[in-house]
Curated annotation (Swiss-Prot):
A lipid is attached at residue 323 (S-palmitoyl cysteine). Residues 334-352 have a biased composition (Low complexity). Keywords: Chromophore, Disulfide bond, G-protein coupled receptor, Glycoprotein, Lipoprotein, Membrane, Palmitate, Phosphoprotein, Photoreceptor protein, Receptor, Retinal protein, Sensory transduction, Transducer, Transmembrane, Transmembrane helix, Vision. Residues 1-36, 99-113, 177-202, 277-284 are extracellular. One of its GO terms (biological process) is visual perception. This is Rhodopsin, freshwater form. It comes from the Eukaryota.
Length: 352
């Protein structure tokens, strides 16, 4: 084995020289230079100061503005709540441990940090599944009388939490375990060694099938059908131009969220699967650290995409930040009025 396994850890370095120590008790500066740990701490600090305000504002603005309380936005708000869980339960812990060069909070803290990181990532994934199914039902109309309402949204939110807990909770109760990974200052599921006592192999297979492959398959199917339907509707002009434009904007926003999720999480999942299928092979701590920390940036992109690509939510956000007045909205209103007046003048002129 090219690593050192302990009661609650696996350090990706052989202990032939005797330098490997428990990541819960000693700094791990034999794995990387101290400046690398400082860089990780600075990165986590950035995610905290950027992730908390934008996710909190997303929640606050939606609660303050009644017109934003639509069923679809329930799912998007659920994403913001999950991101806040990651910020408070995971990022603050990881920043502090990175500053010290090892996981100072012990196995219990590792369980907490790993649980919140996994829970947030899984809620995001299952939210995207619910959004994909919603888009498929609304645009493709497999059920002609279906209308996505408040009850559907509440059930969708509950579903995301149940599925996320089904993935994040088992390691807390003995099916697999959370251990420090990479440079040993953040925690994730154990896919490094078989460990028959915690049934690691069966859990990793269950996780990759039920909580990664299946949801991505559902998302791919829904958007595959959706793209075909949108093309057909555009060609046949079955819907009004305004309706088509609105559906396209929402669909585009959700698709970009899916792509962003894949960009953030597929590298981490791919590296984890590689390590699982090549247990005992040699790999450096940076090999797992970079994709693991990159995946944490997912707490930023969902609210940014939602705000940037949704004009109504963007205007409400600006109104809230500007103490109840949106200066940009006035300019837009003036230009819209001017264009309408011009159009009216043109239409009133009789042909020569």
């Amino acid at each position: 084995m090219n690593g050192t396994e302990g009661p609650n850890f696996y350090v990706p370095m052989s202990n032939v020289t005797g330098v490997v120590r428990s990541p819960f008790e000693y700094p791990q500066y034999y794995l990387a230079e101290p400046w690398a740990y400082s860089a990780l701490a600075a990165y986590m600090f950035f995610l905290i100061i950027a992730g908390f305000p934008i996710n909190f504002l997303t929640l606050y603005v939606t609660i303050e503005h009644k017109k934003l309380r639509t069923p679809l936005n329930y799912i998007l708000l659920n994403l913001a709540v999950a991101d806040l869980f990651m910020v408070f339960g995971g990022f603050t812990t990881t920043m502090y441990t990175s500053m010290h060069g090892y996981f100072v909070f012990g196995p219990t803290g590792c369980n907490i940090e790993g649980f919140f990181a996994t829970l947030g990532g899984e809620i995001a994934l299952w939210c995207l599944v619910v959004l994909a199914v919603e888009r498929w039902m609304v645009v493709c109309k497999p059920m002609s009388n279906f209308r996505f309402g408040e009850n559907h949204a509440i059930m969708g939110v509950a579903f995301t939490w149940v599925m996320a807990l089904a993935c994040a909770a088992p390691p807390l109760f003995g099916w697999s375990r959370y251990i420090p990974e990479g440079m040993q200052c953040s925690c994730g599921m154990d896919h490094y060694a078989p460990n028959p006592e915690t049934y690691n192999e069966s859990f990793v297979i269950y996780m990759f099938i039920c909580h990664f492959t299946i949801p991505l398959t559902v998302i791919s199917f829904c958007y595959g059908r959706l793209v075909c339907t949108v093309k057909e509707a555009t060609a046949q002009q079955q819907e009004s131009e305004t309706t088509q434009r609105a559906e396209r904007e929402v669909t585009r926003m959700v698709i970009i969220m899916v792509i962003s999720f894949l960009v953030c999480w597929v590298p981490y999942a791919s590296v984890a699967w590689y390590i699982f299928t090549h247990q005992g092979s040699s790999f450096g701590p940076i090999f797992m650290t970079i994709p693991a920390f990159f995946a944490k940036s997912s707490s930023l992109y969902n609210p940014l995409i939602y705000i940037c690509m949704n004009k109504q939510s963007r205007n409400c956000m600006i109104t809230t930040l500007c103490c109840g007045k949106n200066p940009f909205e006035e300019e837009e209103g003036a230009s819209t009025t001017a264009s309408k007046t011009e159009a009216s003048s043109v239409s009133s002129v009789s042909p020569a």
